Structure formats: structure tokens, C-alpha cells
Amino acid sequence: MHRIAITNVTGGRNRGCEALVSSITEGLISELGGDNLRLSLHTQDPVYDREHFGSVLNATYSPSNIPPSAMAPRGQRFCYFAAKWAERTPLRRWVPRSVADGLKADLIIATGGDTFTSDYRAFAKHARVLQLGTPVAMLAHTIGPLTAPDEKRFVASTRYIALCTVRESETLEYINHIAPHLQPELTADVAFLLPATAPHIARNIVEVDNGFFIGKRRLAGLAVSTGLLSYRPDVDVDRYVTEIAAFVDDLNSSGWSVLLIPHVQETWRKNNDIYACRDVIRRVRAPLENAVLYSPMSSSDFKGVIGLCDVLVGSRMHTNIAAMSQGVPTVAIAYSRKARATMRDYYGAAVADQITFDVTEIDRHRLRAAFDHALANGTTQSRAAEMRQLALQNFVRVREFLQR
């Protein structure tokens, strides 16, 4: 029996996180067998996730605030050593349940895609898991850019990292520079393996659950992020919404209908995409030609709906991956380097630079030019298949480690 703890998860209401957790659990079960696994999830949304992932998880924990994230790595390691000792005594009642689970695990899978960057100003909090003393697998990460203090902390926290795979070449180069002893391997984001809801069901989700008749409409998907406005103070909110709405108007005038995709719906309003999608739809000239997908949907449901579209324009990483994994032409609105790096690996630099741009550069004309370029570039099913094979290697490496 292999005990695996999946950590550093915001929660399944963030459908990008849900896509990661679902893909990881499916990948582990496929590679190792479900009867041979005990899976736990450490999440900031334990009540929701306990129900949402309950069929595949044995336990769900809320992360502990002990030890403090500001403590030096050496001090954190001492705290966890003390907790491990306490687990063998009556003092174990004082050890946080999430800490006890991490200490007992055979392997920790530290997930989150780009959790281990400085973009969200929470690196130290997430890096505590690297000090537990349990082997850690970092699967298909974007790591960095890190501030100087965060980079110093990361380099001082690598002793228990047993496996490091990365999802794009820029991270590979960065880790080979700052921590070559980790021997990073380039794979692909595990969400390339996420199953998509079947087309006929996805169509019903749009038409029945959301009341938008597709008929012979030509569909474009548009994932509008509320969250990036919190992480990028240099973005003008009004311009962001206005230019996206004008782009939708332009598509409508060309015979397209747009499905607005609120891929992240956290309880924290500043990271709930329904608000940004609503603001956009309120500004378009022909709102009834488009739809915001308000109904409850899983990450697989969103992926199935994206598969109905001819093009996806996304400011959320895992909507873009949902499109690329199906060969759907994709435009990336980037708020960090992860989008550009992933697009370059998938499409090649020449194409990626035409269909990827920073959110501060957003305007209706640039959006339309990128959209037309992506459409002309065509579908990419063969590249999608290659990426799925690379994503499978993450779980092959986990199996090889556990069977040593």
C-alpha cells in the first residue's frame, strides 16, 4: 500500500486545481492500481473538496499554519522532526492532522502548476511542505520566476525533493541553473490527460443547463479571468473589460457566438471569474448572441464545452491546456511567463508569439489578429497526442520511484 499526499491545493472550485487533482488521481490509479493506494488531499477548501473528490480520496485535510511560513527552512525541519517524535508519544494529539498525514506518507505530490513562483506572493507558505522529511515529487511544475529571497529559500529546501518534472522549457533551464542536482525532466502538464465530457453531453450543458441554443452557430470560447486583476496591479480594469467586450462585438459581427467560461469560481470574489464574465457580457452590443456558462460544471465539463469551439481565447492556464490537449486552436492572454513558455513549447516560438500576448497589451484589434492567426494555423491533434504522452511520463516516474 502506497500512501500519497497531494498538497498545495487551493481547492476544486478553482477548476484549474480540480483539473490537476483529477488528472493526478487518475494517473496514479492507472499506473499503480487503485487497490494499492491511499490518497489524501491537503486543500484550502476541505469541505467542498471532501465531497467533490470523495470517490477517489481516503482523506482530506486543511493545511496547518504550523510551522510559520516566515521561519527559516532549518527551523521548519526541526519543527517537523519534533512532530514526528511526538507522533510516537501521547503528545501526538497536539500534532496537526495534516502534518501527521504528511509525515506518514510514502510520497508527497506538491501540486499547483505554478504554486512555486513568486507571482502570488505566497511562496514561503507553500514551500513548507518541502521540509517535512517525506520524499516530495514536484510534478509538471512551472517554477519561478522567484525573488531573490524566495530563490534562496527554494535552494535551501531541496534535500527531500525526490522527483522534479517541469511542464515547459524555461523552467527546465531555470532549475538546471539554480538547482541542477534536482535533475529536472521536461514532461507536460498533467491536465493534458484530463478526460473531456462527451460532446453530446457538453452540448446539452450549453443548451439545456445554460439555455443557449447552439444550432449551427460557430462557437468561440473565451475564458475571462477575474484573478489576474489582483496579481497584476498594472492592468487597467475598465480597459480590460471594455476591450474584451469590443472583441466579442467584433466576433459577433463576423458570425461568431462566444461562450464565456468562468473557469475559477472561488468563494473569494477577487478570484471568481463569474464577475469578470458578467461585466463583459453586460457591455457587449448583442448579449443574446453569446452566453456566460453559469451552471455548475466540472473541469471535464468545461473541457468538453471547449471541444465544441473552433477557437479558445484564454486568460486561464488550464482552459488553454483543455483546448490544446484536444488540438483546438488557442490564443493565450498571459499574466505571467507560464503562458508564453507553455505556448512556445507547444506551437513553437514563431506561432506562439503571434497568438500570445501580455494582458497589459490587450486591445480588440490584437485579440482579433491573434484569433485569426490561431484559426488559420489550424487544429493540432498530433501535437496534442505528443503532449499527452509526455504527461504520462509524470506517473511513470512516480511508479519507478515508489518501486525502487
Residues covered by each model-derived region:
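Active-site anion-handling motifs in enzyme catalytic cores
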Residues: 1-404
